[in-house]
Amino acid sequence: MIVGIGSDLIDIRRVEKTLERHGSRFRDRVFTEIEQRKSEGRKQRAASYAKRFAAKEACAKALGTGIAEGVFWRDMGVVNTPSGKPTMHLTGGAAKQLQKLLPAGTNAAIHLTITDDFPLAQAFVIIEALPVLE
């Protein structure tokens, strides 16, 4: 059962300007260490950060809160499964909000797709409640 859907579209140039203007202050406030390591190693650094920013916005929308109600930027991080598929890892307020969405006897599956085509980056998040298998 789908319990949340979110999407976001962002201009990569906006993220690039913010990175130039605020540097590590912006990176440390918004992105996890894993996201920073991944993005800093990329040739298209601003596009990598923009996709991750869009993923966080989309995830916050799927949670039904936006960046509010105890959900902070660093509570949501883009990670990859062993096969390379992107997904979201939630902590803190985001993890608490996720638990509120889930019916009893279910676990969450967070589906994420991210893409970019300069000057835009886009993300879609679907949060699914799956029955717990005993």
Swiss-Prot record:
GO molecular function: holo-[acyl-carrier-protein] synthase activity; magnesium ion binding
Keywords: Cytoplasm, Fatty acid biosynthesis, Fatty acid metabolism, Lipid biosynthesis, Lipid metabolism, Magnesium, Metal-binding, Transferase
GO CC terms: cytoplasm
Record-linked Pfam families: ACPS
One BP term from GO: fatty acid biosynthetic process
The EC number(s) this enzyme carries: 2.7.8.7
Compartment(s) of residence: Cytoplasm
Binding site for Mg(2+): D8, E57
Catalytic function, reaction form: apo-[ACP] + CoA = holo-[ACP] + adenosine 3',5'-bisphosphate + H(+)
Names of the cofactor(s): Mg(2+)
Taxonomy, superkingdom: Bacteria
EC category name: transferase
Similarity section: Belongs to the P-Pant transferase superfamily. AcpS family.
Role this protein plays: Transfers the 4'-phosphopantetheine moiety from coenzyme A to a Ser of acyl-carrier-protein.
Protein name: Holo-[acyl-carrier-protein] synthase
Species this chain originates from: Brucella canis (strain ATCC 23365 / NCTC 10854 / RM-666)
